[in-house]
A protein has these predicted regions:
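Phosphate-handling catalytic cores of nucleic-acid transaction enzymes
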Residues: 1-316
Length: 316
């Protein structure tokens, strides 16, 4: 379709892919950073934001694969539970010297984490999925409404996860403290400007500088929805989704991280560009935007990581 729709797909696809690259890190200020991005597409009603659904398809096969793994864990847990109850009965009758160990609860494995959920549920899903997850929501106020609720306000989780800072919570069902040492969360949202303001009311909000935004202008002409030459998105994306699943699994099985590096020339260009941008922002807009430029640099570095591993994967 048009250039704007292709750009929209590119932005949202980068967001989805950024959440599908586990065990892949780069060194940034001495810390290991992953590829995770927060993206928000802003546009009026009916301007074509629905194209985001194609980007979500890139992770759909991986998501379904995770759900199948969860079903297998649940079936295994049921079998182990039967065995545990039998051994417990024998122990209670004095026929076993040691009490049996109760099997751990099955994990809720998935790639996509629902936005309309509680803070504790989000942290639990991250913990059960090795800290990884993607929040993908085409109506931005779904997340905004949850963040306004006391039980659903996980804004602090989003802010910490952007930098992979540890998060912790108390699991009442097992009466235990749970830590997620390195959350790696990606977020892809779309909505109108009013919906954006519900989520991020001002630049002072900590989420503002963590998101990359794409402004969708829309198209004045009415497109023919019956065009027979229209591209078969479904077939192409199904093939791509399978490739991304294979890449996701290959990285998941690694015992150590795959590393990303910039060479000396690239490092110099990177530092020079953002130093100039920071000076320009301070003199032209406001010194209060310093943090936004710093995080913009992190996003740029992460996009470079994504593009590099995709090229590497295709070549190898």
């Amino acid at each position: 379709h048009g250039a704007e729709e292709r750009e929209l797909f590119l932005v949202s696809a980068l967001g989805v892919i950024s959440g599908m690259l586990p065990n892949y890190t780069g060194n940034y200020f001495g810390s290991n950073v992953g590829t995770n991005l927060y993206c928000f597409v802003v546009g009026a009603y009916g301007t074509g934001k629905g194209a985001l659904k194609w980007a979500r398809q890139l992770g759909e096969i991986t998501h379904l694969n995770r759900l199948d793994e969860a079903k297998e864990e649940e079936a295994r847990h049921k079998r182990d539970k039967v065995q545990y109850n039998m051994q417990l009965a024998l122990y209670n009758k004095g026929k076993l010297a040691e009490p049996p160990t109760e099997p751990a609860q099955p994990r809720h494995l998935k790639l996509f984490i629902p936005a309309n959920t509680t803070k504790t549920a989000v942290m639990q899903l991250l913990e059960e999925n090795d800290g990884n997850g993607i929040i993908f929501e085409t109506e931005g106020d779904t997340l905004a409404d949850m963040l306004r609720q006391d039980y659903g306000n996980f804004s602090d989780v989003l802010r910490k996860a952007f930098h992979h800072e540890p998060i912790s919570f108390f699991r009442r069902s097992n009466n235990e403290d749970v830590d997620v040492p390195r959350p790696a969360l990606s977020v892809i949202l779309s909505g109108t400007y009013d919906q954006l303001l519900k989520l991020i009311p001002s630049i002072d909000n900590g989420l503002y500088s963590r998101f990359c935004f794409y402004i969708l202008e829309g198209n004045d002409t009415f497109r023919n929805p019956f065009d027979k030459d229209d591209f078969n998105h479904g077939h192409y994306l199904a093939q791509s989704a399978e490739e991304f699943k294979q890449l996701y699994l290959a990285l998941s099985y690694r015992e150590d991280d795959m590393k990303f590096f910039l060479n000396e020339r690239q490092q110099q260009r990177f530092v020079s560009h953002f130093a100039h941008l920071k000076e320009w922002t301070q003199s032209t807009i406001s010194e209060e935007m310093d943090g936004s430029v710093n995080r913009m640099a992190v996003m740029c570095y992460r996009i470079a990581m994504i593009l590099s591993i995709l090229r590497y994967y295709r070549l190898h």
